[in-house]
Amino acid sequence: MYQSLMTVRETQIAIKEVKTFFEDQLAKRLELFRVSAPLFVTKKSGLNDHLNGVERPIEFDMLHSGEELEIVHSLAKWKRFALHEYGYEAGEGLYTNMNAIRRDEELDATHSIYVDQWDWEKIVQKEWRTIDYLQKTVQTIYGIFKELEGHLFEKYPFLGKYLPEEIIFITSQELEDKYPELTPKDREHAIAKEHGAVFIIGIGDALRSGEKHDGRASDYDDWKLNGDILFWHPVLQASFELSSMGIRVDSKALDEQLTKTGEDFKREYDFHKGILEDVLPLTIGGGIGQSRMCMYFLRKAHIGEVQSSVWPDDLREACKKENIHLF
């Protein structure tokens, strides 16, 4: 039977410790400035993150103008637009404390309709748009995760230390070649269990089998230069995604990916025009789940143990039977 290592009150205190430490180090190591984040954007702007392209955003109209607005799914595109509007230069970046609602999320131990993450974005030069630069950025972020685990271990030694010294890198195609008989999700479990921490490179495009490792929207990540940070979760005994990130599309990549997905209508949106016409800066960015972080580092079995959200009654009852107490 699962037993949380902390009471609810102790957990709340530790959550603040996790978030404060990580935020400070993320800003320092990646040289990011914190900015205010929107909860909603106009529909016509094209600034909302449409995730895998099928999730429905929450829509409403504004009394004053009647304009259609959308609650954000993430700030993947808004951040790039903001960097341009605020006059940032190459090597400079921003981050936000992003809160979102994803109404169509499939609820389980690691997914909630409420999303909280550190959303960050940084301007890069054309020659930085390489796998090498992507990997160095991942290593920097992984270094912060390692320091966070060490920091928590000093305060709460019963949490233990599980992260390996280094994170390994593998492409989604190499992963398919390594485990051709497994589903993409089971491949993630296998590689994360073997290494403890892994970054899977290249998510969104079809593999040689004709299948995608996973879906990605066509208009923010360059599918050749993106990926996911996965850890092996000691309580769940499964792979566990901490961050999705990548070098963003330039005009060439956006043109190709919009054609592949049959989304040429997006070329008329202000955001997409800004990329196709080389007005918006080249960037790298990502989202780092705050509740996911807390769930991993505090060794929790359910995301509802580290965030307040709404859960169906049957799910709450099932959790109670497993000694999991949701906020």
UniProtKB/Swiss-Prot annotation:
One of its GO terms (biological process) is L-asparagine biosynthetic process. CDD domains: AsnA (cd00645). It is found in: Cytoplasm. InterPro entries: aa-tRNA-synth_II (IPR006195), aa-tRNA-synth_II/BPL/LPL (IPR045864), AsnA (IPR004618). GO terms for molecular function: aspartate-ammonia ligase activity; ATP binding; catalytic activity, acting on a protein; transferase activity. Keywords: Amino-acid biosynthesis, Asparagine biosynthesis, ATP-binding, Cytoplasm, Ligase, Nucleotide-binding. The keyword ATP-binding applies. Gene3D superfamilies: Bira Bifunctional Protein, Domain 2. Pathway: Amino-acid biosynthesis; L-asparagine biosynthesis; L-asparagine from L-aspartate (ammonia route): step 1/1. PROSITE patterns: AA_TRNA_LIGASE_II (PS50862). It catalyses: L-aspartate + NH4(+) + ATP = L-asparagine + AMP + diphosphate + H(+). It comes from the Bacteria. Its main location: cytoplasm. Its EC number is 6.3.1.1. One of its GO terms (cellular component) is cytosol. NCBIfam families: asnA. Belongs to the class-II aminoacyl-tRNA synthetase family. AsnA subfamily. This is Aspartate--ammonia ligase. It comes from Bacillus mycoides (strain KBAB4). The lineage of its organism: Bacteria, Bacillati, Bacillota, Bacilli, Bacillales. The gene is asnA.
